Amino acid sequence: MENHNHRLGRRSFYFALASPVCLAAGGLRPPPDDPKRGLRQQKRTSEWNVLDYGAVGDGATDNTKAFQLALDAAGAALGGRVVAPNGRYSFSGSLRVPKDVTLRGAFASPPSHSVTQTNQRPEYGTVFLPRGGAGSEEGPAFIDLDTNAVLQGVCVFYPDQKLDPPPVPYPYTVLMHGNSPAVLDSELLNPYNGIKVEKGGRQNVRNVCGQPLHIGLFVDEAYDCCRLENVHWNPYWTYETPLSRWQLDNGVGFVFGRTDGQFALNTFCFNYDIGYKFIRTKAGAAYGNFSGANAELCHACVHVDDCDTWAILFSNGGYALLDPPRSMMLRVGPRNRGSVRFSNCAFWGPTDRCALIEGDSIGMVAFANCTFAEWPENRAMPQDQRWKRDPCIAALGGSILIQGCEFRDHKPQVYLGPDLRGAIVSNNIMHWAVDIRSEMKQQAIVKDNLGLPPANQEKKSTAD
């Protein structure tokens, strides 16, 4: 970043030479008062401190008015940074961050706090304590970010949220709209709903962690490459408590409606009913790429109701389950008409199945260079149906493409249902005999799949 301090020093020196005394000595008159001079001076101011507007970080005083005054002052000056120093700031209402304004706390990276594990409560740094809106998801978000507005370096903690289920509903913590708003380097410790992105483009959520209880992040009407990077949802606040179980049965880590060219890099969620959910809203559905998108201990790591024709592309992801028999890594619903593709991903359990595909006739699901492990014999399935559904991947609708993958368990690998439109299963390696079951009415290509002998037999033959 360019340093302008030396310029300011020289400028001050020249202004001193041009003082009224010097001008008079040179036979020059000072210019008349400029009515716009005050406005220009205000524009040169780039930083405001909330303490100068009456904010008190004692954990009890309502700071809604003081913060909004500081934010509005920055907005009136056409942008700048509003600083919230160390303190625990309580709020009874909502904040609106105007265009081109940054609300900046003390943290340089997302902090970490826990109540049930380490009793490390959010007592230091810049901590926001919202209290308004309890009892309903409706209503204004706690922090509203307009075009080019930024929230950075804070911890948001709801002090009145209870540890017993069900949790108290609140509106979203952050609403992002317009172009290029951002949430950076922050912790959303225990919101009911975390971040909502809508009606704009180039939104940026980077280096954000926490434990949203109901919905972590919701994206819809994002028309120009919304970006998520290093977003990490983990139950720091209530791990292994009844409320944590409520979250597992009811929560969703990420929800994507209409988002054009979505980018998601190194995202993670743990302990949700659904990790990544893709839906079709009135505005449309999603397409984009998800690299390093991981989900663990979810009933469905990825659930696709529908996606856009141009595909949702997963690469280098890991999907793990610990709660059979309800759980599975991937479920594609019967309304999906788009393409869902996984490359270089790992799926492991224990689980009843890794993937259940029920797509529309024009839907497509593809796996390439993936690893599958730890799917059992589907104990909850009716006995007469187990042969159809107990394979690792059950493909019932749309088309399926499975190439270059590894299946590590000695159980059936793939079932191809009668309503499939097309299937290619080729060049895969199985750590047991090849067991691909088909009831397809259409032609399928199933070839060049290698079944390995049991590992213990291989060791025995080597010893002989």
Predicted regions and their residues:
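Acidic Gly/Asp/Thr-rich repetitive segments characteristic of extracellular carbohydrate-active
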Residues: 50-85
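The right-handed parallel beta-helix/beta-solenoid scaffold, focusing on the short coil/turn
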Residues: 80, 87, 93, 99-101, ...
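Extracellular beta-strand-rich solenoid/capping regions of secreted or surface-exposed proteins
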Residues: 68-76, 89-104, 110-152, 157-180, ...
